[in-house]
């Protein structure tokens, strides 16, 4: 894993990509830091800088992660990785930690800005609140990196990987607004869960190469959903609402912006990161044996 990490991290700075991405995020934070915090004397860095520039991650993260696995598949070097002594988890984690380290560079500059505010007369409580906000911002970025790394492994085209990552993050960014549009009741919930059941059944059928198993899985899931819709429709609606809430990737960060250290937000981001790293490892494991 260490060799993969070093190789990936160095590759970002052999060309211009690492420098451009770091400069892009630092410039975004720097402009808001200057315009809001220094000129107006506002000490809430988490809100006036990080929260105001969080949409920049929609561009930064997909471009950062687009080449992680897609380039390997395009150049066919993924076959060398999959047949090397390094485990699948070593490959996935090595690439993930390399991208997280690149993302940590602009975050380190943000930390310097926070200490500048403190040196100019900020309180210790404001310093701790801003550092907590930066910590959650980093966890948010790591969760987005894990998601985009997974999407990068599904294609060998870097542009498609970047567009898919941007689309997924944009959907998560807009989900708090979109969630109110889907509160139409249990019928909508049934339709959405049926679609999810179909996708899960298709994945099960493809993974096992069994059409019969896929059909039986879909039939069983549909039967269960129909029974739940007829007998306990409120449960279906509540579950649907919980699913939509789980898709709001950027919402937990607001707890830190409001100067409240939220353990559930930390657990949420760590869980999202672990889930998508697991999906990536499973996809690579499948290709290794195929």
For the regions a protein language model found, what residue spans apply to each?
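Hydrophobic, membrane-inserted alpha-helices
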Residues: 4, 142-149, 195-201
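Secretory targeting signals
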Residues: 29-36, 40-56, 98-165, 173-184
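Helix-loop-helix units of permease transmembrane domains in multi-pass membrane transporters
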Residues: 68-100
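Residues that define the loop-to-transmembrane-helix transition and helix capping
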Residues: 19, 89, 158-159, 264
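Transmembrane helix segments
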Residues: 158-256
């Amino acid at each position: 894993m260490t060799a993969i990490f070093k190789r990936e991290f160095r590759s970002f700075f052999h060309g211009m990509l690492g420098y451009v991405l770091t400069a892009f995020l630092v410039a975004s934070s720097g402009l808001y830091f200057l315009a809001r915090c220094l000129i107006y004397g506002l000490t809430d860095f988490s809100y006036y800088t990080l929260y105001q520039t969080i949409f920049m991650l929609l561009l930064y993260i997909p471009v950062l992660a687009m080449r992680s696995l897609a380039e390997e598949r395009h150049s066919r070097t993924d076959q060398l990785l999959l047949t090397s002594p390094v485990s699948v988890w070593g490959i996935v984690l090595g690439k993930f930690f390399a991208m997280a380290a690149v993302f940590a560079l602009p975050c380190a500059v943000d930390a310097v800005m926070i200490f500048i505010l403190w040196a100019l007369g900020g309180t210790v409580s404001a310093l701790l609140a801003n550092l907590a906000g930066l910590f959650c911002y980093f966890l948010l970025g790591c969760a987005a990196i894990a998601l985009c790394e997974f999407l990068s492994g599904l294609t060998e085209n870097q542009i498609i990987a970047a567009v898919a990552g941007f689309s997924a993050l944009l959907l998560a960014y807009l989900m708090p607004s979109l969630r109110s549009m889907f509160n139409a009741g249990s019928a909508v919930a049934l339709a959405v869960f049926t679609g999810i059941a179909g996708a899960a059944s298709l994945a099960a059928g493809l993974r096992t190469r069994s059409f019969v198993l896929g059909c039986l899985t879909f039939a069983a899931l549909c039967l269960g959903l129909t029974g739940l819709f007829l007998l306990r429709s409120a449960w279906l609606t509540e579950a649907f609402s919980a699913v939509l809430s789980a898709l709001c990737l950027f919402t937990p960060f607001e707890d830190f912006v409001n100067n409240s250290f939220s353990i559930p937000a930390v657990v949420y981001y760590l869980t999202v990161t672990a889930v998508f790293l697991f999906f990536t490892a499973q996809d690579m494991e499948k290709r290794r044996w195929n």
